[in-house]
């Protein structure tokens, strides 16, 4: 998940001069990310649940893994409530001025500001599964 904020978004910011094109590039990155990241998160959650069920059936401690699973999935409400407004603003700008009457294309400064905000929020979102892994590893040691 950190590849996007550490490499992809800085590359977009370095190469984009047209605000609509820059927003469209972000929208393409989002398109591929949304097809990859949620299945990975769901798979991770299923693995946590499977391990929790195994441990419970063997009367072993499982609470820490449950905390790790919940923390990992915390990125979903974070995305819906914190990141969605920025996503929606970038999607509107990616549509360009021709998409809706009376709409003007965003300035390069506006798109850049939204991308920088999205980048910071995505880093924060990426910390949920990372924290979940750290919690799970602390249980394994």
From Swiss-Prot:
Induction notes from the record: The cluster is expressed in rice fermentation medium. Three regulators are located in the cluster (ptaR1, ptaR2 and ptaR3), suggesting that the production of pestheic acid is controlled by a complex regulatory mechanism.
Residues spanning the membrane: 33-53, 64-84
Keywords: Membrane, Monooxygenase, Oxidoreductase, Signal, Transmembrane, Transmembrane helix
Residues annotated as signal peptide: 1-19
Principal localisation: membrane
InterPro entries referenced in this protein's UniProt entry, alphabetically: Anthrone_oxy
Pathway membership, UniProt: Secondary metabolite biosynthesis
EC numbers on record: 1.-.-.-
Disulfide links within the chain: none
A GO CC term assigned to this protein in UniProt: membrane
Membrane topology: Multi-pass membrane protein
Annotated localization: Membrane
Database matches in Pfam families: Anthrone_oxy (PF08592)
A GO term for molecular function: monooxygenase activity
Family: Belongs to the anthrone oxygenase family.
Functional description taken from the UniProt entry: Anthrone oxygenase; part of the gene cluster that mediates the biosynthesis of pestheic acid, a diphenyl ether which is a biosynthetic precursor of the unique chloropupukeananes. The biosynthesis initiates from condensation of acetate and malonate units catalyzed by the non-reducing PKS ptaA. As the ptaA protein is TE/CLC domain-deficient, hydrolysis and Claisen cyclization of the polyketide could be catalyzed by ptaB containing a beta-lactamase domain.
Protein name: Anthrone oxygenase ptaC
